[in-house]
Amino acid sequence: MLLIIFILPTTLAVIGDFNCTNFAINDLNTTVPRISEYVVDVSYGLGTYYILDRVYLNTTILFTGYFPKSGANFRDLSLKGTTYLSTLWYQKPFLSDFNNGIFSRVKNTKLYVNKTLYSEFSTIVIGSVFINNSYTIVVQPHNGVLEITACQYTMCEYPHTICKSKGSSRNESWHFDKSEPLCLFKKNFTYNVSTDWLYFHFYQERGTFYAYYADSGMPTTFLFSLYLGTLLSHYYVLPLTCNAISSNTDNETLQYWVTPLSKRQYLLKFDNRGVITNAVDCSSSFFSEIQCKTKSLLPNTGVYDLSGFTVKPVATVHRRIPDLPDCDIDKWLNNFNVPSPLNWERKIFSNCNFNLSTLLRLVHTDSFSCNNFDESKIYGSCFKSIVLDKFAIPNSRRSDLQLGSSGFLQSSNYKIDTTSSSCQLYYSLPAINVTINNYNPSSWNRRYGFNNFNLSSHSVVYSRYCFSVNNTFCPCAKPSFASSCKSHKPPSASCPIGTNYRSCESTTVLDHTDWCRCSCLPDPITAYDPRSCSQKKSLVGVGEHCAGFGVDEEKCGVLDGSYNVSCLCSTDAFLGWSYDTCVSNNRCNIFSNFILNGINSGTTCSNDLLQPNTEVFTDVCVDYDLYGITGQGIFKEVSAVYYNSWQNLLYDSNGNIIGFKDFVTNKTYNIFPCYAGRVSAAFHQNASSLALLYRNLKCSYVLNNISLTTQPYFDSYLGCVFNADNLTDYSVSSCALRMGSGFCVDYNSPSSSSSRRKRRSISASYRFVTFEPFNVSFVNDSIESVGGLYEIKIPTNFTIVGQEEFIQTNSPKVTIDCSLFVCSNYAACHDLLSEYGTFCDNINSILDEVNGLLDTTQLHVADTLMQGVTLSSNLNTNLHFDVDNINFKSLVGCLGPHCGSSSRSFFEDLLFDKVKLSDVGFVEAYNNCTGGSEIRDLLCVQSFNGIKVLPPILSESQISGYTTAATVAAMFPPWSAAAGIPFSLNVQYRINGLGVTMDVLNKNQKLIATAFNNALLSIQNGFSATNSALAKIQSVVNSNAQALNSLLQQLFNKFGAISSSLQEILSRLDALEAQVQIDRLINGRLTALNAYVSQQLSDISLVKFGAALAMEKVNECVKSQSPRINFCGNGNHILSLVQNAPYGLLFMHFSYKPISFKTVLVSPGLCISGDVGIAPKQGYFIKHNDHWMFTGSSYYYPEPISDKNVVFMNTCSVNFTKAPLVYLNHSVPKLSDFESELSHWFKNQTSIAPNLTLNLHTINATFLDLYYEMNLIQESIKSLNNSYINLKDIGTYEMYVKWPWYVWLLISFSFIIFLVLLFFICCCTGCGSACFSKCHNCCDEYGGHHDFVIKTSHDD
C-alpha cells in the first residue's frame, strides 16, 4: 500500500509550529529519561493484547503481532514543572519515533483535595507534523475519564497541561485553533480511577491506528481502531505543570514508562475462560524458540535444531566516492519555464550527490510518495542514476496521475511505469513567475501547418487522443482529381515528395455524377469507417510522447489567401487536445516522477545520512556500506588486476558482491560471508537451562556476540559447546540427547554432580561425553526372532534400462465471456441473465483463479528447472515436430499477384500494342479482309446500310503513308493531285465510320427512352390499381376491426376479461412464454458452462498434480539419485535427464532392474538375551547358514550385524494393529414408481373448461371484390413486358498495331550484332577452338587402346 508522506525526515520533526506563549520559557538543561530497573516480563501476559473478534479456550497458539521484546527496559518520559518550561523538553530524546507502536505503563497519581479524589497522569500526543493538515491523536485524562481525540490540531510550539487537583500558575495550552478543528474521532472512555497503574498498547498497521487498555498487568483489551490512511511518525508525553507539588510525596510522583513495539511472534496460552495466562516471545531466547517450535511451555527432553547463528559484526566499513559534485536537482525543478504534459521534459542525474531533505524543503513539496520502493530508504541510498520527468498539472486532470489510471494524462500524454521503482513528487511554484511551455512534439503535425497554441502563460495543453500515421501520409487530395469532381469537391494541394495523396474516389449517386468521397470522414475521432482512415488512434507508452493530434482532412489544402500550393492545414483542423490552468491559490501545480535506476549499485547518492569514509577492517565480521550497497562480511586484502578504471565492485554469477576496489586507497579486497553455523540445543525436562552446540564455529567467534557469566564453554569436534562440562574421555552406552558423530550430552541432577562441582570452579548440569551404544557379540543360541520368519526374494543381478516419461505441467489458458456465451447478442436474454446474480462473475473468477494457478504452477516449475538443472538437447525421443513437409496450400489458397490472371500470346504482347474500340458490325469484317496487311486499307472498305465506312483507328505506318500522299499532292499540282485521293477517301470513310457508330448509339438511346416511358406509364397504371385495391382492403379491414372491437367489448362485458385489450393479453402471454423458453435455454447453457468449468477445474487439478510431480522428479531424479524404486524409471534409479516439451517436461530415466533373485528367510527384528531388541536399518536380518546376518534391501550382500546397521529398542514385544474391513457402498438407491409418485402429488388436481358461447352473428363478414384491380395490374405487367428493348449490338474489338519501321530496324541491327559476337566467340578464341577439337575427336574411330608414340632423332 502506498502511504503518502507529508513529512521531512525525522531529524526535522518538531512539536507544532505555533507560538502560543512566551511566558516563563527557558533552555535550562534537564535530565535524560530514566531507564527502568525492571524489564518486560511477558510470562503472565504483560505486553500482550487480545486478538480482535476471536476467543480461544484451553489452547496454545502462535500469533504474530506488535509486541514488546521480552526483557526490554522501559523509559520514563514524564515531565513535571511548576512555573517554567524548558525548551529542551520538546526535543529528543523526549520527542520519540513512534515506528510500529509503543507499550506504556503509566502511574495513576491519586490525590485527595477537599475530600475529592483526583486521578492525574500525563497526556500523550501521537502524530506526524503536528499541524492542521495532518491528524494528531491525543489521549488525555479529564475529570475521571479518558478523553481521546483524533483531529487536525495546530499544536503549540511548547505544549503542556496543568494539574486539576492543585491548579497551576500557567494556563493549559497545547493546541491553538481559531475554529473547531476537523476531527475523525472524539470519544470519552471510563477507567478505574482507583487503580495504581494503567497500561496502554498503541500500534499502527496499514494506515490504521489501534488502541488497547488495561488497569492491571494482565493483557490489554481493545479500546478503538481508526483508519487514518497515513503513518504516524512521532509521539510525545506533554509536561504537567502544578503549583507547589511536594517532591517527597510518592503519590505525587509522575511516571510514564514507555517501551517500543515491533512485529514479533508470541506463543499465547489461554485458559478455560479465554484469558491469556502465559506468553512467550519466540525470538527472545533459545529456550523460547524451543517452546514456540513445540507449542508447549514445557517441552519434552530432546535435542532441537534452532535457527542459524551468524557471528555479529564488530565494526562498520563505509565507502563513498569523494568530492562528487551536487546534483542541483532543485534548480531544475524550480525552473520557471515549465513544460506541459504534451511535451513533458526529462533529465538524467548521475555521478553526483543530492540531499533529499533539503530538496523537499526547497521545492515547496505538497506530497512525496514512492512505488515499489520504501521512500524512507532513499535517505542515504545510492543509485546508478535518477531520471526525472516533470510537467505542469491541468487542475481538472489531477486525478489522472494516480497509479494505474487510464485518464487522458496517462493514456495520451505521459505514462507512469508502475513496474519500476519510482517516486512521485507533487510541488508548486509561484504563478507570477511561471510560464508554461506548450510545444507540440509531433513532427507530422508541424509538417502540415501546426505552429503554436496561442494560449496564456498559465494554460496547460494536454492531449485527449493521440494519432499515429506512416511516413507516406498526406492529408490533402490530389489537385488533378479534385478538379474532376462536380459534387463534394475535396480541398487539394501538393503533397511533399515521398508521400501519398489522400485516398479519394469518384462515384455516381442518384442524379449526381462525379460525386467525390474521400477517406477519414467526418474526422479521425468519429470516422464512419476507422479502417479507411490513415490516422490511427494510439496510446503513449512508457517514455513516449504523444505521436500527434488528429487532423480534419477536410480542412487541409491550399489555405485561403496563401500563395503556397503545398499541403497545409488550418489551425482548427487539429483535433483531440484541450487545456486548463495549473494555478490554484496563486501557485502553479507541477508533477515530477523520480525513476530510480540501479538501486544500491551506483554513485548517485543521497547524503542525508552521510557518514565519513572509515578504515577498512580485515579478517573480522563487519557491517559495510560500499557506494550504497549494504551487507555483512569479512574483508581480506588481495592483489587484483581485473578492475578497470570505471569498475569498483566484483560480483558472482548470482549477483552477490564478493569484492571491491577502494577508490580512496586504491586497494582491492575480497568479501567473504561472516562465520555462520547451525545451533543445536540439548534440553532436559528436569533442567532449568540448555546446553548449546554452535556447530562448525569456534568459541572465539561466538564470544564476540555473547556475554558469559558462569557458563562453561569449550571447542569440540562438532563446534563450540556452551553450558556443559567437557568429559569426552567418558563414554555412555545409552543417551537421550545425542549430538551426532558419536557424542552425547548427558544430564546430571544437581545432587549427583555436587562432588564434581567442588573440583571445578565453573560447572554445569550437562556433560559432553562420548556415546558408545551397547555392542553385543552375537551368539546364535541367545538370539530370537521378533515377529516371526518370512520368506522374501532379494535381487542378486541387475541390468540397465532406460525409460521415457512425459508429465504435463501446463495447459492453454481459457477465458470465457459468460454473458456472450449464454446469450450471444440477444438483449432479452441479457436482461433475464442479470437475475441470476453473480453466476457469471463466479465463472470468471474461477477461470481467473485457474489461469493464475497455471501461471503460478509454471513459475514454480521454471524455478525448479532454473536451479541446477541443465536441459538436455540430445535426447532421442519419439516426439517430432517437423513441419517442413506439411502442405498448407489447400487451406491458404493461391497467394501472390498472379492468381486468377490470364494473358494472350507472349509474342503478340511483345511485338504489338493493343487497342480496343467499339464495333457496330464492320470492324471485325475489315480486319478479316486486311489479314494484317495495312496496305489493303482502302481495298477493304466496308458497307454499312449502303454507306462506305472504315474503322476510326490508324496505325503509325498508315498515318505516315497518308500524310506523305497528301504532302506530295500538295507539292506538285496538278501532276501529283491524284496522290491525294487515298488520303481524302481515308478521311471520309473513317468519318462515315464514326457517324454510323453515333447513329447506332442515338437509335439505342431513343429505344431506351421510348421503352422507359412506356414502362413508367404501366407502372403508374399498376400503382393506381394497387391504390384502389388497397382502399377497398382498408374499408373491409376497418369494418372487420369495428366488428372485432364489438366482439371484444362483448367478451369484456360477458366474461369479465382480465384486460381491456386482447392484444395486450396475448403479448403478455407471449412474453411470459418467451421468458420461460429463454430461462430454459439459459439454464441449459449455464449447466453446460458449469460442467465445462468443472471439467476445467478437474483438468487443472491434474495439471497441478502433474507439475508437483514433475518438480518432485526434477528435485529427486535429476538433481539427485532417488532411493525410491520405480519412481524414477523402472527399477533402482541411476540418473535422469529432463527436456522441455509442449505443455510439459520429458524425462529420460536410467535405472538398473533386477533380473535374478535369491530367496531368504528374514525377520523384522531380533531379541538379544530376552530383553534387548534390535531392528535392521535400511535392510533385513537374514538367516544365512544358521547365522543371523544383515543384508541391504536392494541387493543381496550378507554382512555381520553391527551398531551401524541396527536400531536399538527397549523391549522385544511387537504391537499389532488390525486393519478394519471397510468397503465402499456400491448399492443403487431405490426409488418409488414414477407414475405412483405423480398420482400422489396430483390426484386431486382437475381442470374444468368454462362454458363459453359467442354471438358470431354480430360479426360483420364482408367479402372483397378486387377482380377489376387485379386485371388492371395484369395489363400493366404485360405492358412492362412489352417494353423490352432490342438494342443494336455494339461489340468490342481488339486489334493490334504494328511497331514503326525504325523499331524493326533497331531490332534487326541488334540481332546482327549478336550473331557477329557469337561468331567471334566461337571461331576466334581458344574457347571456340577447344569446342571444335572436342567435336572433331567425337567423330574419330575408336578401336581400343592406343599407345603414345614418341619420335626422337639423334646422332650415332
UniProtKB/Swiss-Prot annotation:
Pfam families: bCoV_S1_N, bCoV_S1_RBD, CoV_S1_C, CoV_S2, CoV_S2_C
Residue segments, region Heptad repeat 2: 1249-1289
Domain BetaCoV S1-NTD: 14-294
Residues glycosylated per entry: 19, 29, 58, 114, 132, 171, 188, 192, 251, 355, 433, 454, 470, 564, 666, 686, 705, 726, 775, 780, 797, 928, 1215, 1225, 1244, 1251, 1260, 1281
Membrane-crossing residue ranges in chain numbering: 1301-1321
Keywords: Coiled coil, Disulfide bond, Fusion of virus membrane with host endosomal membrane, Fusion of virus membrane with host membrane, Glycoprotein, Host cell membrane, Host membrane, Host-virus interaction, Lipoprotein, Membrane, Palmitate, Signal, Transmembrane, Transmembrane helix, Viral attachment to host cell, Viral envelope protein, Viral penetration into host cytoplasm, Virion, Virulence, Virus entry into host cell
Region of interest: Heptad repeat 1: 1005-1055
Extracellular side: 13-1300
Membrane topology: Single-pass type I membrane protein
Leader sequence segment: 1-12
Stretch list, region Fusion peptide 2: 924-944
Site (Cleavage): 760-761, 904-905
Motif residue range(s): KxHxx: 1352-1356
Disulfide bond annotation, renumbered to this chain: 20-156, 151-183, 163-242, 282-292, 327-352, 370-423, 382-605, 929-940
Post-translation changes: Specific enzymatic cleavages in vivo yield mature proteins. The precursor is processed into S1 and S2 by host cell furin or another cellular protease to yield the mature S1 and S2 proteins. Additionally, a second cleavage leads to the release of a fusion peptide after viral attachment to host cell receptor.
CDD domains in UniProt: HKU1-CoV-like_Spike_SD1-2_S1-S2_S2 (cd22380), HKU1_N1_CoV_Spike_S1_RBD (cd21483), MHV-like_Spike_S1_NTD (cd21625)
GO terms (BP aspect): endocytosis involved in viral entry into host cell; fusion of virus membrane with host endosome membrane; fusion of virus membrane with host plasma membrane; receptor-mediated virion attachment to host cell
Coiled-coil zones: 1034-1078, 1262-1290
Residue numbers spanned by region Fusion peptide 1: 905-926
Topological domain spans for side Cytoplasmic: 1322-1356
Ranges where the BetaCoV S1-CTD domain occurs: 325-607
Domain notes: Fusion peptide 1 (FP1) and fusion peptide 2 (FP2) function cooperatively and have a membrane-ordering effect on lipid headgroups and shallow hydrophobic regions of target bilayers. They are considered as two domains of an extended, bipartite FP. The membrane-ordering activity is calcium-dependent and also dependent on correct folding, which is maintained by an internal disulfide bond in FP2.
Protein family according to the UniProt entry: Belongs to the betacoronaviruses spike protein family.
Assembly notes: Homotrimer; each monomer consists of a S1 and a S2 subunit. The resulting peplomers protrude from the virus surface as spikes.
Additional remarks: Isolate N1 belongs to genotype A.
Protein name, entry field: Spike glycoprotein
Organism expressing this protein natively: Human coronavirus HKU1 (isolate N1) (HCoV-HKU1)
GN (gene name): S
